[in-house]
């Protein structure tokens, strides 16, 4: 069993894959690895670039698909064929710091953590010009023995994760009812995790080019709402404090969609927003179901089905 499995969904990344894969090749540290790339029916030359750029790397799998389902589905697909103790999850249009994986893996083993999150740095450079810096030894790391509480905060949505494969399986991976995995993955993992590490280590460097699905604002609002709504409905046993927090997040996502011009029950939403601020909103009430229906009616978002 390898120490880590890189699980890497790919969609139309032909132009940037050579630089990302170069940073994979340049990883330092004493660990064994396998590489699982899952192509999401790319319409560019991503598959041929993957084959060319990974030639000579041991233990590479390239999983091909004929339909486009989104990163949440493809991440789960890749995780199912992984065999490593830990999964390493990155976006394929960034550059990885040379000791990123060794740093995350070392932290996980030192603290007995089953999920570790690193930071990212947005640059003004094209990806070809990025020279990611080595992570220093004296990085600050917060240890969270209540992972769900931390996951309901901010700052964990970037794909800079190292997680135990067993935890990923136990949590069911990403919510496949939501196209983008950024919000659902940390939430679902944290609900089952024993220890989450949040480190200041900058593990990926992000170029000033291209576009992320999560840059689409209505897609972002839709997927945030659906993530929290699904989680609420799937976990009726959650503590009331967490249910209240999740309800607030649903209201916030809907309010932002309304602000951006999408049809929502406006007056009721404003009342719900202020009720949530006062801790009076009931997350189990019918109003969230009405918002769910409103989001389902929005045509300008991508859905796995």
Where do the protein language model's features map onto the residues?
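Catalytic core of nucleotide-sugar-dependent glycosyltransferases
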Residues: 201-209, 214-241, 262-277
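Membrane-interface aromatic/basic loop that binds lipid-linked glycans or pyrophosphate carriers
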Residues: 1, 260-305
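Glycine-rich, basic loop-to-helix element that forms the pyrophosphate-binding segment
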Residues: 65-82
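A conserved acidic beta->alpha catalytic loop
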Residues: 39-48, 67, 91
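Conserved nucleotide-sugar donor-binding catalytic segment
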Residues: 141-219
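Conserved donor NDP-sugar-binding/catalytic core segment of glycosyltransferases
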Residues: 101-131
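Short, well-formed alpha-helical segments that are part of the catalytic scaffolds
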Residues: 13-26
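Short aromatic/hydrophobic "clamp" motif used to bind/position activated sugar donors
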Residues: 87
């Amino acid at each position: 069993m390898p120490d880590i499995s890189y699980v890497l969904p790919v969609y139309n990344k032909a132009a940037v894959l050579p630089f990302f894969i170069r940073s994979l090749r340049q990883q330092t540290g004493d660990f064994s690895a396998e590489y699982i790339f899952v192509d999401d029916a790319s319409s560019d030359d991503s598959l041929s670039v993957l084959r060319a750029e990974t030639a000579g790397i041991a233990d590479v799998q390239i999983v091909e698909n004929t339909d486009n389902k989104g990163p949440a589905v493809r991440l789960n697909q890749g995780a199912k064929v992984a065999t490593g103790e830990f999964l390493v999850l990155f976006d394929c249009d960034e550059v990885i710091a040379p000791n990123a994986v060794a740093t995350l893996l070392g932290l996980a083993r030192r603290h007995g953590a089953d999920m570790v999150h690193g930071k990212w740095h947005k640059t003004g450079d094209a990806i070809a010009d990025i020279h990611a810096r080595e992570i220093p030894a004296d990085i600050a790391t917060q240890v969270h023995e209540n992972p769900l509480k931390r996951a309901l905060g901010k700052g964990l949505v970037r794909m800079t994760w190292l997680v135990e494969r067993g935890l990923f399986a136990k949590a069911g991976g990403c919510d496949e009812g939501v196209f983008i995995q950024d919000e659902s993955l940390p939430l679902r993992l944290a609900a089952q995790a024993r220890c989450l590490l949040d480190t200041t280590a900058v593990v990926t460097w992000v170029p000033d080019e291209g576009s992320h699905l999560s840059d689409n604002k209505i897609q972002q609002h839709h997927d945030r709402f659906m993530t929290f709504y699904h989680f609420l409905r799937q976990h009726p046993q959650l503590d009331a404090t967490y249910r209240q927090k999740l309800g607030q997040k649903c209201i916030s996502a809907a309010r932002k969609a309304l602000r951006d011009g999408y049809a929502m029950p406006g007056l009721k939403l404003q009342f719900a927003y202020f009720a949530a601020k006062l801790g009076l909103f009931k997350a189990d009430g019918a109003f969230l179901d009405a918002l769910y229906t409103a989001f389902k009616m929005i045509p300008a978002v991508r859905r796995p089905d």
